[in-house]
Each structure stands twice: as structure tokens, then as C-alpha cells.
């Protein structure tokens, strides 16, 4: 994101729309920054927020819903409450990237994820059915 912003600012400077100034945020760490990252940990994507995500629900909610892709009830809850995920696609594509890692497995766990989402969002079975219908339409584009 910084590179995109830098390029945009430099373009504006080059056409005399902005005056050149020293960058004020060059050393600013991104939200969730962590100095030492354990890349093998599937929770590494949360950086310094990892422990908050893990403790967001109960300790039993840190067990993955799948053996193939990593997604927990705590991640689902965190994504809804702190990242404004509202649809099954939001969770399985945008927040966890599960759909890109294993589309078939994402399809298999989608009902569990939708049920947990409905519980958190206080939605009914009709909402779950609609989300699953939309997701099953989408997933066809990812399963080879």
C-alpha cells in the first residue's frame, strides 16, 4: 500500500499538483506489525494481534474447522466484529483466503462457517441458505 501511495504522490508532484515534502510516515509501522514473524504459524497474518484473535472466543474456539486449511471460530468471530465481514465470501475469500488455498475444502466447510456466522450475526436459517447458495455459485469459478 505504501508503494502505491508513494507512486501516486510522486505522480502528483511530477505534474506540479503537489509540492515535494519529506515523508512523515516512512518509519510508521503498519497496524499489527510484529518484528519477528513465525511464518509456519497459520496465525502469523495477525501479527501483534495474534493473541487477541486467539483469545477472542473460548480456548476451544482455536481448533481449526479443517485439517487442510486453517480457520477457527475465533477467526470467524474476529473477522465479523473487527473486520466487518458480513458474507461467507468475505470470510472464506477476503479474510482467510481459504477459497484460494483449497476451494474444495472451502466448499466442504462452508456450512459450518455459515452457521457460526449466523450465530454471531443473529441471522436465521434463511440467511444461511442464501449465503450457501451464493457461495456455491462463486466456488464453481475456483474448482477445476
Predicted regions and their residues:
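C-terminal accessory subdomains/tails of enzymes that are appended
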Residues: 1-144
Amino acid at each position: 500500500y505504501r508503494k502505491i501511495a508513494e507512486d501516486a504522490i510522486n505522480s502528483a508532484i511530477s505534474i506540479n499538483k503537489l509540492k515535494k515534502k519529506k515523508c512523515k510516515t516512512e518509519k510508521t509501522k503498519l497496524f499489527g506489525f510484529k518484528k519477528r514473524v513465525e511464518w509456519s504459524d497459520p496465525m502469523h497474518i495477525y501479527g501483534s494481534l495474534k493473541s487477541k484473535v486467539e483469545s477472542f472466543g473460548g480456548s476451544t474456539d482455536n481448533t481449526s474447522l479443517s485439517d487442510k486449511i486453517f480457520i477457527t471460530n475465533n477467526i470467524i468471530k474476529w473477522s465479523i466484529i473487527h473486520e466487518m465481514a458480513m458474507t461467507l465470501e468475505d470470510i472464506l475469500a477476503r479474510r482467510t483466503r481459504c477459497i484460494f488455498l483449497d476451494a474444495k475444502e472451502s466448499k466442504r466447510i462452508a456450512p459450518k462457517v455459515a452457521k457460526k456466522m449466523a450465530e454471531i450475526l443473529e441471522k436465521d436459517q434463511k440467511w444461511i441458505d442464501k449465503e450457501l447458495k451464493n457461495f456455491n455459485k462463486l466456488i464453481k469459478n475456483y474448482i477445476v
